[in-house]
């Protein structure tokens, strides 16, 4: 039987700091290439990659898990020893449970947050498009989405949760008090920026500006917010005009450097700028935090705020874990039954060959005009002898130390009671 198994590995906000996570993230436009590289250069049959600001995880089907895990460092041109301390490896049942917990929001920085479910679905679509999603992973994610829906509909896991977007707004209010007098700049136009923009817009800031590489998408968001649009090229001149900056783009390199912020602060005559960088890899150079008049927060810095209200939801967590555990058992039953299918198929094929052989022999005897009753008797004897030959041979030739186990096994298979 093949030793190919379900396997998951990766890093997340619990095991690795931001400066490590950003080194192994996968931009959306590089996902297909990465998936092809993994299945082409490693003993991996199926693969899906989940890459968010808080995690990079690979779900795969492989018979050599160690080679699969080494790929992550190799692909990003990192020494394996540098990534090793932060990696988790989850074989079979642990991989299933982890997938269910992630989709249900139990493994998120924001407990119960719904965005991860959409991110998982995006990962599945990418794997489907790349042709790396086989039956095993398809079944896993199909069940994963079912479990996540059950958890969210049967528990209050998402109640009173503080999203990253809400946390950004709360932090801004702590620094400025009334956001209604502040000018807010959003860099990017993806889902996270849209969520943040909705929270800030509800506070009616003095002005909202959206900067994005694709102007059309920025215009659509700005229109909903009654804001204005600028291009990324205009950032050096426009930055000083804003009090609050929230950024989350898919750029692989920082777009806001220390020098640009120094010039902006000088132009603002040292009035403070509040910045939230929700991107991974980061949009803002970490050195910007060294500036006295810049309050820079990353996704990891928001952790304490998003944990507010966690104690009140421990009951919901216990309910969710129970739902997940039950579904893990069911999925493992399916997985284990799937692994014996080839053996069952081979057994049936062998029986079919016996049947056809005896049937053809009987037909030839009938064609010769021999007694049908004798032919039927001969056919039944032939089938009986063929079916019993191999187990009988195994019993007669078994080694002494394995004979008792073999007797027990055959007795159970054929419901025998030899001692009676």
Swiss-Prot record:
Provide the E.C. number(s) assigned to this enzyme.
Answer: 1.2.1.70
Q: Which residues bind NADP(+)?
A: 188-193
For this UniProt entry, the molecular function terms from Gene Ontology, in alphabetical order, are:
glutamyl-tRNA reductase activity; NADP binding
Please report a single Pfam family linked to this protein: GlutR_dimer
Q: Note the InterPro entries from the entry.
A: 4pyrrol_synth_GluRdtase, 4pyrrol_synth_GluRdtase_dimer, 4pyrrol_synth_GluRdtase_N, GluRdtase_CS, GluRdtase_dimer_dom_sf, GluRdtase_N_sf, NAD(P)-bd_dom_sf, Shikm_DH/Glu-tRNA_Rdtase
Could you tell me the keywords of this UniProt record?
NADP, Oxidoreductase, Porphyrin biosynthesis
Q: Where is this site: Important for activity?
A: 98
Catalysed conversion reaction: (S)-4-amino-5-oxopentanoate + tRNA(Glu) + NADP(+) = L-glutamyl-tRNA(Glu) + NADPH + H(+)
Could you tell me what this protein does? Catalyzes the NADPH-dependent reduction of glutamyl-tRNA(Glu) to glutamate 1-semialdehyde (GSA).
Q: What is known of its domains?
A: Possesses an unusual extended V-shaped dimeric structure with each monomer consisting of three distinct domains arranged along a curved 'spinal' alpha-helix. The N-terminal catalytic domain specifically recognizes the glutamate moiety of the substrate. The second domain is the NADPH-binding domain, and the third C-terminal domain is responsible for dimerization.
Q: Which family does it belong to?
A: Belongs to the glutamyl-tRNA reductase family.
Its UniProt miscellaneous note says: During catalysis, the active site Cys acts as a nucleophile attacking the alpha-carbonyl group of tRNA-bound glutamate with the formation of a thioester intermediate between enzyme and glutamate, and the concomitant release of tRNA(Glu). The thioester intermediate is finally reduced by direct hydride transfer from NADPH, to form the product GSA.
The name on file for this protein is Glutamyl-tRNA reductase
Source organism per entry reads Nitrosospira multiformis (strain ATCC 25196 / NCIMB 11849 / C 71)
């Amino acid at each position: 039987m093949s030793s190919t198994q379900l396997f998951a590995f990766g890093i997340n906000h619990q095991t690795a700091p931001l400066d490590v996570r950003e080194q192994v993230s996968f931009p959306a436009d590089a996902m297909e290439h990465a998936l092809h590289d993994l299945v082409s250069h490693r003993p991996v049959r199926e693969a899906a990659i989940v890459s968010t600001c808080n995690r990079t995880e690979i779900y795969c089907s492989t018979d050599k898990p160690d080679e699969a895990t080494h790929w992550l460092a190799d692909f990003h041109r990192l020494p394996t020893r540098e990534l090793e301390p932060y990696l988790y490896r989850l074989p079979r049942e642990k991989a299933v449970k982890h997938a269910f917990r992630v989709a249900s929001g139990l493994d998120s920085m924001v407990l119960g947050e719904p965005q991860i479910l959409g991110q998982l679905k995006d990962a599945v679509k990418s794997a489907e498009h790349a042709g790396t999603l086989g039956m095993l992973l398809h079944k896993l994610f199909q069940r994963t989405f079912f479990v996540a829906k059950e958890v969210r509909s049967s528990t209050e896991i998402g109640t009173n949760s503080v999203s990253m977007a809400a946390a950004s707004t709360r932090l801004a209010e702590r620094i400025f008090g009334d956001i209604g007098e502040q000018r807010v700049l959003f860099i990017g136009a993806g889902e996270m920026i849209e969520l943040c923009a909705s929270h800030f817009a509800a506070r009616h800031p003095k002005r909202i500006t959206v900067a994005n590489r694709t102007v059309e998408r920025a215009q659509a968001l700005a229109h909903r917010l009654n804001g204005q649009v600028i291009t990324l090229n205009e950032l050096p001149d426009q930055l000083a005009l804003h009090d609050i900056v929230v950024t989350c783009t898919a750029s692989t390199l920082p777009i806001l450097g220390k020098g640009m912020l120094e010039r902006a602060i000088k132009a603002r005559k040292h009035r403070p700028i509040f910045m939230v960088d929700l991107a991974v890899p980061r949009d803002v150079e970490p050195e910007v935090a060294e500036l006295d008049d810049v309050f820079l927060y990353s996704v990891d810095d928001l952790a304490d705020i998003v944990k507010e209200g966690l104690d009140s939801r421990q009951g919901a967590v216990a309910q969710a874990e129970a739902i997940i555990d039950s579904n893990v058992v069911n999925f493992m039953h399916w997985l284990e039954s799937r692994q014996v299918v080839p053996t069952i198929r081979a057994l049936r094929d062998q029986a079919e060959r016996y049947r056809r052989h005896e049937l053809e022999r009987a037909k030839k005897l009938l064609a010769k005009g021999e007694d049908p009753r004798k032919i039927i008797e001969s056919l039944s004897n032939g089938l009986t002898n063929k079916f019993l030959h191999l187990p009988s041979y195994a019993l007669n030739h078994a080694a002494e130390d394995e004979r008792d186990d073999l007797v027990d096994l055959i007795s159970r298979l054929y419901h025998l009671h030899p001692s009676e």
